[in-house]
Amino acid sequence: WIHEQYNNWVMTKNKLDLIFKSYDIRGVYGDSIDQDIAYKIGKAFAEFVPDDTIIVGHDGRVSNIEMLDAFTSGIKSINKEIIYVGLVPTDTVYSLSGLLKKPGAIITASHNPKNYNGLKLCNAGAIPIGENSGLMDIKKLADRNVEIRIEKFKINDKHLGNEYYEHLKNLVSPESISQKLNFGIDGGNGVFGAVFDTLNNIYKFNVKSIYLEVDGNFPNHPADPSDESNLTDLKNLVIDND
């Protein structure tokens, strides 16, 4: 039994060393990051922040529901509450963290390939948690043998989208935009597609769009705009509608 526990600890430590980066947590799902690791990070994050309630959202990756179940189970293991905001961009979680003065977590691997997943964490007030501001403390807390009990997260219908959109309108009111702006948008099958219609109903831009359907398999091209080859379809969209 002791040998098994030691092996489990070594395995967890090796995975944590691989996935904890300077500003976030990222790894190949099912390999360096999995439900057990997500549970431990959820528990560690809940212990690290002093607040009783944590905002949680996620993007459209195919492994996100499993990650959500495990991460939220870790949070709830120490009896903390969750404000679930659903399928949203990272900006939404950070904005709500600032508005509500609550810590937040978004399950995402940003522009990494589809087989990756991870987490971005922030303190209350949308203060990012990075290598020199608490992320390594969370890693240490996660590096323990704990009883893992993962339960299906019960998704409720209480989202905070309205608060986010009202915040955007306070920053830039629709009335302040005197000229109709023309945009070409490639959603890259990422989570932006989940909020685009609401944003466009507010600001009423002239938009030509492609790939707004949220699909964690990224069937049209990788969700990495830093690679210029992924911008080919967007360039053609703009040229064709000039």
Show where each model-derived region lies.
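An N-terminal, well-structured beta->alpha segment
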Residues: 9-73, 77-79, 154-181
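Gly/Ser/Thr-rich beta-alpha loop segments that engage phosphate groups in nucleotides
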Residues: 26-29, 59, 88, 120, ...
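N-terminal small/polar loop signature for handling phosphorylated ligands or for N-terminal nucleophile
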Residues: 54-117, 199-242
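Active-site flanking residues adjacent to catalytic metal/cofactor-binding acidic residues
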Residues: 23, 58, 108, 185-188
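Short, glycine-/Ser/Thr-/acidic-enriched flexible segments
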Residues: 26, 61, 112, 126-127, ...
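Gly/Ser/Thr-enriched, mixed-charge loops and adjacent short helices
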Residues: 117-240
